[in-house]
Amino acid sequence: MRARCLHPGCASKFSLQVGGGNDHMTRHAKTHARADGEAAAIQSRINFNPDGTSRGIFVYDSARQREALATLIAVNDLPLGFGESPGFVEYIRTAHTPSFTQVSRQTTSRDMKKLAKAGRVAMKEQLVSSIFSVSITSDIWSGRAKQDYITVVAHYVSSSWELNKRIIGFELIDVSHNGVNIANAILKVVTEFGLTDKIFAVTLDNASSNTTAMNTLIPIFEVYASKFLLHQRCACHIINLIAKSALDDLDPHINKLRLAISWLNASNTRLGDYRNYCAVINVPCHGLHLDMPVRWNSTYLMLQLVLRDQVQFSAFVNANFIQNDGEPLLVEATWHVAETIFKFLATFYESTVTLSGVYYPTSHLIVHYILEIAQHLKEYENDATLLVAVYNMKQKYLKYWQNIPLLYAIAFILDPRAKMEGFSGVLSLLSFTINVSYDQYSLDVKDKLQDVYSKYELKYGPAVAHRPPAVPASGRGKKKVWGKIFGTSTATPSSSTQTPVLQGGGELAKYLNSAVLATNDDDDDDFDILQWWQEKRSTYPVLSILARDVLSVPVSTVSSESAFSLAGRIIDDRRTSLTPDMVKTLMSVKDGELARRRAQHTTENPELIAAFEAMRWTEDQDET
């Protein structure tokens, strides 16, 4: 006869003999009792935060552990079988709880799908029940396994007036990327989330197929707002087109720097000698990376690094690289031109970074950059190095931004620091800079703003029983940028006693006819426009809803492109066998967790930055 241990997880068996003792089974049972006592002591204990404050009694919960493990795997792009890897299991049992049971790949996959499903249900409920409108971005990405995916990203202002971004669609698109198929893919996702009558705007890049797609989508989506607001072209894509038009003309001016970088990287011996040289003269040693021919921002980053190391790099190259004519390769003129081009490209790079934000509104900022880029091009139009490049860039600029998109204009006017007065100042400066009249455009913008406000008044006005009078904005001083716009040396807006901008007694008229908000130099950059409108809900109950919708529109599709950065890490060389359904699941869980942490904010291309920063060989040293 044999006896079996009934303790969970134990498969021990013991022999039984007639008349024999059972001491061996007693000892075995006591072993389990001791282990259970130790586990209980570990599993039920006071838990402390890093700052020493108590988080209460911690009790080990295997279900929560599996959920946390699935989230960990999704967020950190770990293998699905990570929970059964010997090293991880040993670490958890040693450092946290000895009763941890390894979690198989199959179990993790099931847990991941449950998490994704629960997250999508919660997101649907939030979007349908508590959100006025949603603006979306979309793009298409080709993966390593020759599978193309389309992403749909929702941008919306929550009931607490925080701007949010969530990936609501990451779908395999196995048909041609024409406009009809793109429209159908977007519509499928929007319909699944019940958002067909809540779409305020759709931001896409400038591909002709996207224009065709919007021709299909506009009649469906124009239920909520206005047709002229629906289709927005990615501002960062346009900035990219403007900057790229200069590359061919800029290349000859920096080819010597490219040659020097290529020469250095072509030999491990040279790289070692360069590191030793930097160590001898006690300066930080950074790797230098060639730019990518079709990416102007990589040229900017290349110049940024090489200019930082100008002294040591120039000295090393000129001492070791001998040209046929005996002249040094990198002379003062080379560096002067490189610095000119770097400073010239900086405006485009910085504007792209700012306009790629996802946790702060960008729709009211783009008019600033449209003006700034126009003035920047005018400043350099007679520069001997950049003459031809600037001409080409101006033609591209005029093609896309001579006519300012109406949404950008309305968003700028809904900035209480600008209103119609500030917008008129921008148009005056822009007219002078690019020699285009905006007299009629200014009237058109005012008419369109009235039209869309009237639609909101009809939709939301009946629910508003009382509208308190508008409170004129107060304060003094503006930053120089505002002073330039308002055409005053003191940056002070004109008096509110001037001729009314808009006749009537409605909210829009009261807002436009009141004084612009004046902010001081210290807090202007930190001005929270969403918070301002939240605080003015009782003053402008209908107009604040319009402002919330307008300010939720992203002017860039970078949020969609950043989803592909996530996808590229999810579908890396080790995971190309993942099914499209599992890719979507991992994406959903990862985005949900990053959204919870508000850690989705990516304003720069992470892969591009990493390609250059990874070339650093030594830590930066403080200057003495």
Regions found by a protein language model. Name each.
Residues L16-Q43:
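C-terminal recognition-helix end and immediately following basic linker
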Residues E67-A70, E222-V223, A279-H286, Y397, ...:
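Short, hydrophobic/aliphatic alpha-helical segments
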Residues F58, N76, L80-A279, H286, ...:
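Active-site neighborhood segments
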Residues P8-K13:
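Short Cys/His-rich metal-coordination motifs, predominantly Zn2+-binding knuckles/fingers
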Residues L163, G169-F170, D174, F200, ...:
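C-terminal regulatory segments
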Residues M1, A35-G83, E90-Y91, G477-K479, ...:
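Long, low-complexity intrinsically disordered tails and linkers at domain boundaries
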Residues L301-E327:
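Alpha-helical cores of eukaryotic small-GTPase signaling modules
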Residues C5, M25, F88, S104, ...:
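Mobile genetic element proteins and their domesticated derivatives, centered on retroelements
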